[in-house]
Amino acid sequence: MTRIAGINISDKKHILVALTSIYGIGISLSKKICFSIGIRCDVKINSLTKEKIESLRSIISKFLVEGDLRREKTINIKRLMDIGCYRGLRHRKHLPVRGQRTKTNARTRKGPRKLIKSR
């Protein structure tokens, strides 16, 4: 297990897939990181040298990942709620924010149906 950005990454995975286990790094960013270091994407983590792993750590430390990214995201949502804009109100009411319909859909965002007692 290799530890990068505070996350234990399995040595058996290919580097392209292994980097996506870090919150904030997807496939495209993982490809860019591999290209900048000069590593092929189909190489497994356990075959990397210590220098390559250190260069991986240094490049990933420049990005906003894991706890910092989560904190930034919650601060942005809290800011929207504090200024009272439409998006902030939708966040506060736990409704879809981006204009989706709510009459029949949006069960994921609204949560399970509230049962109404029969008379």
Curated annotation (Swiss-Prot):
SUPFAM superfamilies assigned: S13-like H2TH domain
Gene Ontology CC annotation, any one: small ribosomal subunit
Pfam families recorded: Ribosomal_S13 (PF00416)
Gene Ontology molecular function, alphabetical: rRNA binding; structural constituent of ribosome; tRNA binding
GO biological process: translation
Keywords for the protein's UniProt record, in alphabetical order: Ribonucleoprotein, Ribosomal protein, RNA-binding, rRNA-binding, tRNA-binding
Spans annotated as Disordered: 96-119
NCBIfam families to which the protein is assigned, alphabetical: uS13_bact (TIGR03631)
Record family assignment: Belongs to the universal ribosomal protein uS13 family.
Main function: Located at the top of the head of the 30S subunit, it contacts several helices of the 16S rRNA. In the 70S ribosome it contacts the 23S rRNA (bridge B1a) and protein L5 of the 50S subunit (bridge B1b), connecting the 2 subunits; these bridges are implicated in subunit movement. Contacts the tRNAs in the A and P-sites.
PANTHER family: 30S RIBOSOMAL PROTEIN S13/40S RIBOSOMAL PROTEIN S18, SMALL RIBOSOMAL SUBUNIT PROTEIN US13M
Record text on subunit structure and interactions: Part of the 30S ribosomal subunit. Forms a loose heterodimer with protein S19. Forms two bridges to the 50S subunit in the 70S ribosome.
This protein's name: Small ribosomal subunit protein uS13
Species the sequence originates in: Buchnera aphidicola subsp. Cinara cedri (strain Cc)
Gene: rpsM
